[in-house]
Amino acid sequence: MLEPVMFTGGLYKHDLVLELVEDLGGYILQKNVTQTEIILLLLVPSEDMNALEILSRELRGELVRAPLAGTEVAVVTPTLAIHHLPHVACDTAEYLRRHGSKTNMIGMARGVGREIAQINEYETALINEHDAAVFIFGNFGDCIKKKEQLYRNISVPVIVTGGPKMKKEDLPYAFGYVPSIGRMAHRTRKATEIATLDNIVEMVGRALDQTRAAITKDPLTTSPPRVMDAVREQVPEVEFSYSPLPIALNLNGVRVKLPYQLYKDKLAAVTFDEGVRLGEVATIRPSRMKDYILVRILPSSETGFVF
Amino acid sequence: MDPMEVFKIEVTGEEEYGAKKYREIIMDILQDLGLIRSIGRLYVYVDITIPVFAVYGLLRSGIPPLTVKDVGDVMRVGGGHQIKINDEEHMADLLKALWKRYGRERVEQPARDVVIIASDTPPSDLMVTDMEAEFLQDLTDALVRIAPEGFRNRRNVMTKDSFFFIAAEESIKPELISEIEEKIREMENA
């Protein structure tokens, strides 16, 4: 089984880590260089974890488990105005990132208010491209209950956050509810506030585990990290994409950040060692996010094989 | 401890948490904008079933306008007056006021913090900026920030020593205003 971990350390000799992970048959999900520091998100076979731990100790790096690595989470706020940002939404997004997830912040066009809140088809479809969504609501219980219509049609697990304590039966369409983080005008710095952020990460982790369990019942034809590796090798243009993460991983596919019209055929022609082409085991369609390409791997019940 | 004499917040329904949190939000925003010392009493009334958000506040005694002698030292020099600036924050306003009074050709700035005016009348009492107008502008900004975002219909009445702000999702009718005024009066007398 592959274990998701985050390596933080100096830039010097970090290629040793990359080489080791490749030798062990793991995957490099993300590489972030900040001046002399580097943050690597890795998938490493759990039985070989020890080798990486020894190397990271030698390099004076830090190795922590990143339970959300390889997933994309949407942090949704009613709008992008000062009332909702920056504190609660940005802190939540940043905290999720620290635990390895790729987090996108989405501000709705007309999500404000109690009676007038709306979500449109495009926003719903965009949120549905993620693996889970965190909806950030305010301090009034009545409003949180009324705003249920915003996420009722979303098919990925939705975690709602808000101020007051709520009963589970009040929010039947949400996967879970995390209280005591409603609207506020200061940074999350107190121990209780940080603990609330931990609760959100834990709840998101549980939602993703549920999706993973559902996938194992009808496994994907191939794994998303493998698709990522093959695309990176056979479509070298992806490395020239300006996006910090040119291939974003989801639980059931990948998002390739290249123009759809120009690269869809090239992507479909990506061939694996077994001789299978990507177009045969996955659907390739335009993503709702910019002009990107969304690859969704088909389950084995549709293709009839797993490799 | 609240720096205000009175700070009451009332929210209808079972929303104690909301009331407590909005208290924090109001304090945070007023502190951020440096307004907290100018407000004496504050009454906040929220009815989430309508929904409406109202704030009534009494201001502390008026702020005098800022004059030239507040921002620097005025000295008599040969051929005019010299101002040695101590508070650079209002430099732009100061120059604007001097240009308007004396004309650009008579205002000279040989160094960053020195302005010389070729005039015999001392500029000491010339008004640099109206602090009260600035304060009222900041206060309106604070109220818009405090009110929940969806409450887009707003009504703001400001007098010399008080302000009364209502924000609602639906249009604000006269009956609603008088109802809220009544509620706030009750809070004042309680």
Where are these regions (language model features)?
Chain A
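Short, low-order "capping/linker" segments at domain edges
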Residues: 47, 72-95
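Helix N-cap motif at beta-to-alpha junctions
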Residues: 10-11, 43-51, 55
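Short amphipathic alpha-helix segments
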Residues: 8-29, 52
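Generic non-transmembrane alpha-helical segments
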Residues: 16-24, 55, 59, 95, ...
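Conserved short beta-strand edge segments in small beta-sheet-based binding/regulatory domains
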Residues: 5, 27-33, 54-75
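Short glycine-/aliphatic-rich beta-strand segments at the starts of folded cytosolic domains
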Residues: 1-9
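Long, charge-rich C-terminal accessory regions
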Residues: 92-95, 99-263
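C-terminal, charge/polar-rich interaction regions
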Residues: 247-307
